[in-house]
Structure formats: structure tokens, C-alpha cells
UniProtKB/Swiss-Prot annotation:
Residues 1-20 are annotated as: Disordered. The keyword Plastid does not apply. Was identified as a high-confidence drug target. GO terms for cellular component: cytosol. This is Iron-sulfur cluster assembly SufBD family protein Rv1461.
Length: 846
């Protein structure tokens, strides 16, 4: 989903945030940010359990040739015979009888995103996948949902050169000879229990053939998603790079304005929000943005105007809003005279708000306006500064004349009490009370204070120019006593106060949109719901003979005490605010969405909306893929994986390539998330001068085990291999490097280098290294290095002494740690990998 863009000529800078405590940082590590589940009609009807009948049914549904059926049945018998491996992670939690081995999500593969069923299309829109194709960042795209590829496309110029990029099922149908020649030759069914399982029940995946001499310079890309609970995904990828060709295949399991409330109370257009910025969630607290998505909308936009007209915002139909339906809290009295049904205030205050799709939210329903709960700033300012800032917002300006700085405050000549208040504050803060100029014919009293420090303080914390004024992060994070003092001074200078029915009504006007909404946010902290109304200028005007340019004026109004308006109800941590108007329009424009750390929400004009996020179920799912690659003489293949499965997935993958004479095979592997990952990309170097390389990084959080590594078999002379493995563990997580380098007899002149580096964030995590080196030839160069380390306090001290915060210092250390892998990725994926690890590590001190 998403929000429509707000045009903005200038973008405010991201707010400065206090570093997370170690406990907060560690609690946030390893959090999986894509845990929504779509409707699951197909999965609900799928058969559980594995048997010969299930295997025959899969083959029949795909109308496969008999040789493939026989291959599947043979593999099933091997799977039944082989025991669960005990040498690695604990796999006892896998219940093979409870898994759904085939779920068909759509009857027909789509050639365009628009042809996909709406629920599946929305999923990939949320993940931002079509955008990469639109921007020509990839040469071809495949998207697998459940058991089958639902979308497939390849660039026409590559197709004309003979490049084949199909889903594996279509590859079997359309190119049976090539398929049969290579299928199972690199990874036979008998290799291990899970390769046997995959061979028996495989479905989906990618089939790629690159003709001799053809170079595919832009990556081919595939996305895999499990939506169904207890689903097993068993894609089979087969890549053949013919002689002298090159291809880069990228596989990913993670994704790629309205005014959004940032953590300092500022409002910024959604398109200006960046990864790493802090926004306010529906709990009122600051949370990090972990991803920004954009797509083109061709559909309905819903605009909601709450009780506060300037807070109106627009969202797409499916975007969840935090709301309370009026029908659930209304009294039994009938609606009359155009008024909505009255509500029972007790029911409303005790009702539990819930996430409801925008299209299902009606006029009269209640939206949730959370009360901000910012992190208190470590610098506590005196109340005199609060009063001075309040008067400056209302009546002050900072003046720089001939290099001389001053603060000037303009009051009515009758407001001498406020004049003295300003002078006393300046005297206390800057030891200067300034001068007062009374001009009776203008009914004015002007205070001028020459102060360099005061000028800088107001400039930096409140701003210069009436329409540009807003409070800094430092001021917004002061306590309620400070803010109440500031608001009272502001009302003294620029407000109107009346009393009706025992309530005090307060109203102020400002030309600064940002200050108007900051004030609304501050008042919510103080227990008052304020409305904001925009008044457009009527055109140029003349005041006392001078032409003036009129600007938009924002009126902010609220009540204190007595029997004020009760349409918005104070519900403790939030206000329940009624929707006054709901409108729908057809839109053809870009829309944006943010992924935000738990609680997965942000505020649009102060109101709670949900970020769109891959499903997390209480029971486990199984991902058991097989990737076979044949690299012909002098060809080169690079295979990049960035996986971010939810922490209920067993991720058990067999990946192996055969590199022939002069060929190069490169595996770039990033593993984040999952319950258990067991993955060891391998290269069998069967021809002279073949090269194999594995660069991998793994992150293990609480209750996660990343058992990863590599296998290199030197089967011919003058072959070379390189393994670089990086791992990070925290919160009791475990990482393991498990590797094999084998140099067979006759593979003289071979060279191999292995480097394993592990980083432990805390004292409860674990890292293991299980290297196995088998050298059967004399003329061999072999190097192995393994390190386990914590983030050094000396490193942090050195960086912080250069002006970095603890957060920034930690982030720099982590970036350097993963840099050997990140630099090998395409730019978008390097940023994504760095983002995932860097944000998770931020604030955690080893």
C-alpha cells in the first residue's frame, strides 16, 4: 500500500535519535519484517503428507513425461531409506507428515504483473518486485508463489540471442532433451536425504540456458515466497552456461507522500523518508524504517478526513488503518437529522482498536491518534528557555545586521507582563535583559536583546522565518512540564482564549505547517486533542499602505477542562477520533510504503497506518531447494542469493556447480532469518584452470542456527578456489562454518584459500568452525584462517573519539566486517544486505 506523494520543494533532515540501549538493540536483532499472510484458499485445500500417491499426483498435474515420474518415484524410495542427518542442526522438529508438498496458487502463469490474481499481485507489489523490472535493473524476472512460478518475463533482445529463461516446469515441457541431459547430473537424488526429497516433489524454480559466447550483463532474477502454513517449497533450478558465456542469476527471498510523523514530531513527505530514519509507530514510540517501497497505482485511493480537516490523508484500498468501527460502540438510538449514531463513551474507551483495510473503514468510524512517547533527551533545558522559545514562536524573530546578532520580540503595548517575562528569561539565560521600545501610535512594545548565544539557540532550535519555524528534536523530547511552559508562552503571545460551558477554549494561528502539527502532537502528550484547520489566503493585501503577500494559515484549536467537545475521546494512550468524511477516487500515480520495525506501523498526519509486510505462523514450514549449475569451458556464472525467511522456516538447500576447463563459478550467499539454515554451496572443478569461489555472510538471532559453509572439489590440474565466510551471532543465536576442500590425485598445481570470520555480539551466542581439508596431491597451495571475535571496545572508543556516536561506530565496524561480500553484490542488493545487518547490529556493544 501505500500513501500518495506530497510535493515538497525542501526536505527536512532526518531527526537525530538517542542511541538504542544494548538491551533494546539486542531485542530488535533478527526481527523478521515481512510477516503478513495472504488469503489461503489454495493452501487450505492442499493435501498433507508424503506418499507415492502424492508424488504421482504432482507429476500428473504437471503432465510430465514418464521418465520424470520414474525419477520422482525412485527419489522417494531413496528419501524413505535415508535417515535424518544428525551431524548438523537439530532437524527433529520437521514433521514430514504435516507438510503440504504441492500448493497451486494460480491456474495460469502470467506474462505481465497485471495478469496475476489480485492477492498474489498485491503481495509482490508490497515487496516492490515489479519496480526492479520496470527500472531495467534486471534482464529477466521469475516469481514463485507456493509451489509454482506465477510470473515470468525476459528481455526481448536476450531471447533473440537464444537465451532461455523459463520456470523449470516449462523448461521440461519445451526443452525436454536439454533438460533430460543435465537434470540430476550434478546433484543426483542419492546425494542426501533432502536432495532426494526435492527430486521426488520438486516444483517451480528456474531453467536457464545461455548459448555459447552470449554475455548476459544484467542479472536474471527470481523471487520465492511461501504463503501457506506448513507449506514445503521445493523449487529446482537448473542453469547451463555454454562455452564462453556469462550469466548472473540473483535469487532473493526478501523485498526490495503523505506527511509522515517522524520521531521528533516533524512531518515529512513519505517519498523523502529513507532507510534508517525514525518514524513514530502506533504505540507512540520511535521506530526505524527498514525499507522504502514505491509502485505505480492504477486503482482507487481512499481519502479520510478526521475531526481535524488538515489531517486528511489518502491510502490505497487494502492498506490497514488502526480503527474502531462505530457500529461496535454505538448506542441503540436511531440516527437523525444527518447526525451519525451516538456512541457509548465507556464502550469506546474500552474497545480494542484493530487493523482494518481502508476500503472497509466508513465515515463515523474512529481512527487512532496515538499520544507520542519520545525518548527523553539527555540534555534537560531550563523552564526559562521554554518560555523564551514559546514567545519567540509567537512574536519573535532573529536578526543579523552588520554581523551583529539579536533577538527581537514584538508585543502590543498593553502586554507589558509578557515584555517583562521575555526580559527576565533573557537575563536568566544570557545575562542580558535587552531594551524596550514603546511606540504608542503603533500600539507596540518591542524588546531587542543583543545576544550571540540567544540568536544561535533560537536559530538552531526554533528556526528563522515565521513559516519555517519548528521545534528541534532537542525541544520535542523535553518533558511535559517544559512543553506546557512553552505552549503557555506561545498562547500568551499569539493565542485567543475564551471560556464556554466551564471549558477553556484556546486557539492559535501560524503560517508554519510543521509547527502546527508539532503543536498538535505536543498537546496530545499533554492530554488534549487539537484540531488543525487550513485557511487559504484570499490574495495580496495592503496593511498600513504596505503590500503584503498572504500565506496559508493553520488554525490550531483545543479545549482544557469543563464540558468541551467530546467527539474525540481520550482513551489513555491514544485519542479515538471520528472520521468526518470519506472519499474515493481513481488514481494513476506513484504510491509509497514504508517497512518499519516492530510494531510495523507509522503515522500519516498523526494517524496510525500499518506497514505492509511474509507470513509468520506458529508451526513450521520447509524450504528444500536444489540448484544445479553446469559451467561449460571458459564460461562464467555468478549466483547470488539473499535469503530472509521468517524464523519458522527450515531452510535446507543443496547447491552445486560443475566447472569445466577454464570456467568460473561464483556463489555469493547472504543468509538472514529462518529457524535453521543448512546450506553449503559447492563447486566441482572438473576441468583444468577452472575456478570456484564462495563468498557468504550469515546472521543468527535468538533461536536461530545458521549452519553454512562451502565445498570445493579440485578434480583437475591448476584449479583454484576461494572461500570467504562471515557470520554474526547475537541473543543466543548460533552460527557454524562447515566446509570441505578436497584436492584429488592428479589435481597438481591447485590452489585454495579459506577464511572464516565470526563476530559475536554478546556472551550467550555461539560460533563453531568445522573445516575439513583433504589433500591427495603434493603440488598444492592451501591456506586456512579462522577467527572468532567480539566488537572491540577499543575500536568503539577510537571511532567515538572522532565524533561518532556509539550507534555510528558500531555500524561502521559491521559495514567493514561484511564489506568483502557486500562489494560483490549488485548495488541494490549490497544496500539491502548492508541495511539488514547494519540496522540489526545498531546499538549493540560486544
Amino acid at each position: 500500500m501505500t500513501l500518495t506523494p506530497e510535493a515538497s520543494k525542501s526536505v527536512a533532515q532526518p531527526p537525530t535519535q538517542a542511541p538504542l540501549t544494548q538491551e533494546e538493540a539486542i531485542a530488535s536483532l533478527g526481527r523478521y519484517g515481512y510477516g503478513w499472510a495472504d488469503s489461503d484458499v489454495a493452501g487450505a485445500n492442499a493435501q498433507r503428507g508424503l506418499s507415492e500417491a502424492v508424488v504421482r499426483d504432482i507429476s500428473a498435474k504437471k503432465n510430465e513425461p514418464d521418465w520424470m515420474l520414474q525419477s520422482r518415484l525412485k527419489a522417494l524410495r531413496i528419501f524413505d531409506r535415508k535417515p535424518i542427518p544428525k551431524w548438523g542442526s537439530n532437524l527433529d522438529g520437521i514433521d514430514f507428515d504435516n507438510i503440504k508438498y504441492f500448493v497451486r496458487s494460480t491456474e495460469k502463469q502470467a506474462a505481465s504483473w497485471d495478469d496475476l490474481p489480485e492477492d498474489i499481485r498485491n503481495t509482490y507489489d508490497r515487496l516492490g518486485i515489479p519496480e526492479a523490472e520496470k527500472q531495467r535493473l534486471v534482464a529477466g524476472v521469475a516469481a514463485q508463489y507456493e509451489s509454482e512460478v506465477v510470473y515470468h518475463q525476459i528481455r526481448e533482445d536476450l531471447e533473440a540471442q537464444g537465451v532461455i529463461f523459463l520456470d523449470t516446469d516449462t523448461g521440461l515441457r519445451e526443452h525436454p532433451d536439454i533438460f533430460k541431459e543435465y537434470f540430476g547430473t550434478v546433484i543426483p537424488a542419492g546425494d542426501n536425504k533432502f536432495s532426494a526429497l526435492n527430486t521426488a516433489v520438486w516444483s517451480g524454480g528456474s531453467f536457464i540456458y545461455v548459448p555459447p559466447g552470449v554475455h548476459v550483463d544484467i542479472p536474471l532474477q527470481a523471487y520465492f515466497r511461501i504463503n501457506t502454513e506448513n507449506m514445503g517449497q521445493f523449487e529446482r533450478t537448473l542453469i547451463i552456461a555454454d562455452e564462453g558465456s556469462y550469466v548472473h542469476y540473483v535469487e532473493g527471498c526478501l523485498p526490495a507522500g503523505e506527511l509522515i510523523t517522524t520521531a521528533d514530531g516533524d512531518l515529512r513527505p513519505i517519498e523523502s523518508i529513507r532507510v534508517g530514519d525514525f518514524v513514530t509507530g502506533h504505540d507512540g514510540r520511535p521506530h526505524r524504517v527498514t525499507a522504502v517501497q514505491v509502485r505505480d497505482l492504477d486503482g482507487e485511493l481512499f481519502t479520510f478526513t478526521p475531526m481535524s480537516p488538515a489531517n486528511a490523508f489518502s491510502v490505497t484500498a487494502e492498506h490497514p488503518l488502526l480503527a474502531i468501527p462505530r457500529d461496535e460502540v454505538r448506542v441503540m438510538r436511531k440516527e437523525r437529522n444527518g447526525w451519525k449514531a451516538e456512541v457509548n463513551s465507556t464502550k469506546l474507551r474500552s474497545a480494542e482498536p484493530r487493523w482494518i483495510a481502508a476500503k472497509d473503514v466508513a465515515e463515523g468510524d474512529f481512527l487512532i491518534y496515538p499520544k507520542p512517547k519520545p525518548i527523553p533527551h539527555r540534555t534537560v533545558l531550563p523552564l526559562e528557555f521554554a518560555r523564551l522559545a514559546g514567545y519567540y514562536l509567537a512574536e519573535g524573530h532573529a536578526c543579523l545586521t552588520n554581523g551583529c546578532e539579536s533577538l527581537i520580540f514584538s508585543f502590543h503595548s498593553d502586554e507589558f507582563e509578557y515584555v517583562e517575562d521575555v526580559r527576565q528569561a533573557c537575563k536568566s539565560l544570557y545575562e542580558k535583559s535587552g531594551s524596550v521600545l514603546i511606540e504608542e501610535h503603533k500600539h507596540s512594545a518591542r524588546v531587542t536583546v543583543y545576544t550571540k548565544a540567544g540568536y544561535a539557540a533560537m536559530r538552531d532550535n526554533v528556526g528563522i522565518g515565521s513559516s519555517n519555524k519548528k521545534l528541534s528534536d532537542l525541544l520535542m523530547r523535553q518533558d511535559e512540564t517544559f512543553l506546557r511552559e512553552l505552549v503557555d508562552a506561545y498562547v500568551n503571545g499569539d493565542g485567543n482564549v475564551t471560556r464556554r460551558n466551564g471549558a477553556v477554549w484556546k486557539r492559535v494561528h501560524t503560517t508554519s505547517r510543521l509547527w502546527a502539527f508539532q503543536l498538535q502532537s505536543i498537546l496530545a502528550r499533554l492530554g488534549h486533542y487539537a484540531t488543525v484547520e487550513l485557511r487559504r489566503p484570499g490574495g495580496p493585501g495592503v496593511i498600513m499602505g504596505r503590500n503584503v503577500v498572504r500565506k496559508d494559515i493553520y488554525q490550531v484549536q483545543w479545549t482544557e477542562g469543563g464540558r468541551g467537545p467530546k467527539q474525540a475521546r481520550d482513551c489513555g494512550d491514544y485519542f479515538a477520533v471520528p472520521i468526518k468524511k470519506r472519499a474515493v477516487r481513481e488514481a494513476h500515480e506513484p504510491v509509497y510504503n514504508l517497512d518499519v520495525e516492530n510494531p510495523d506501523s507509522y503515522l500519516a498526519y498523526g494517524f496510525a497506518v500499518h506497514n505492509c509486510t511474509a507470513p509468520i505462523y506458529k508451526s513450521d514450514s520447509l524450504h528444500s531447494a536444489v540448484v544445479e549449475i553446469i559451467v561449460k569451458p571458459h564460461a562464467r556464472v555468478r549466483y547470488t542469493t539473499i535469503q530472509n525467511w521468517s524464523n519458522n522456516v527450515y531452510n535446507l538447500v543443496t547447491k552445486r556447480a560443475r566447472a569445466e576447463a577454464g570456467a568460473t563459478m561464483e556463489w555469493i550467499d547472504g543468509n538472514i532469518g529462518s529457524k535453521v539454515t543448512m546450506k553449503y554451496p559447492a563447486v566441482w572443478m572438473t576441468g583444468e584452470h577452472a575456478k570456484g569461489e564462495v563468498l557468504s555472510v550469515a546472521f543468527a538471532g535468538e533461536d536461530q542456527h545458521q549452519d553454512t559453509g562451502a565445498k570445493m572439489l579440485h578434480l583437475a590440474p591448476n584449479t583454484s578456489s576461494n572461500i570467504v565466510s562471515k557470520s554474526v551471532a547475537r541473543g543466543g543465536g548460533r552460527t557454524s562454518y562447515r566446509g570441505l576442500v578436497q584436492v584429488n590425485k592428479g589435481a597438481h598445481g591447485s590452489r585454495s584459500s579459506v577464511k572464516c570470520d565470526a563476530l559475536l555480539v554478546d556472551t550467550v551466542s555461539r560460533s563453531d568452525t568445522y573445516p575439513y581439508v583433504d589433500i591427495r596431491e603434493d603440488d598444492v597451495t592451501m591456506g586456512h584462517e579462522a577467527t572468532v571475535s567480539k566488537v572491540s571496545e577499543n575500536q568503539l572508543f577510537y571511532l567515538m573519539s572522532r565524533g561518532l556516536t556509539e550507534d555510528e561506530a558500531m555500524a561502521m565496524v559491521v559495514r567493514g566486517f561484511v564489506e568483502p561480500i557486500a562489494k560483490e553484490l549488485p548495488m541494490e542488493y549490497a544496500l539491502e544486505l548492508n541495511r539488514l545487518i547494519e540496522l540489526q547490529m545498531e546499538g549493540a556493544v560486544g
